[in-house]
């Protein structure tokens, strides 16, 4: 990915000077006419438009798609960039939030907050997330979620059930445990 950002003037972050990268400039020069016509260019045709949140890509964050059937949320601890339209969340208790958003509890309670598009796909835009009320947990519990979410993201499927049970306990939903654990999103 070529990130020739325009900098963040308010924070003193300078724009990328394409002349510092002659091989990339030579490649982009073959598209110069198209670059020059762009409405969303930065200070030069080589630079992207201003992005006030560019530093958020270098933070731990939750990454999730704009539209999806399965509502997957990934905790990114390695500062990845995406090449598709995705959303990101930064802030506190990201491991807990990742666990919560991937849980049956979230799907049962909030799936209908997100518009149903064709074929059962849901739109996960920010405006719909703003309507979601997320139960808070103690900071000490977030550490447990951090370990469990890491294991799930490494492909340890056995941990998914444990993670769901930890959420049930943390949110005091034991009386609904059987329903939550047996919930099948495909039947809805």
Predicted region positions:
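Polybasic, glycine- and aromatic-enriched phosphate-binding surface used to engage nucleic acids
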Residues: 1-141
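Non-catalytic DNA-recognition/assembly elements of restriction-modification systems
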Residues: 23, 31, 136-188
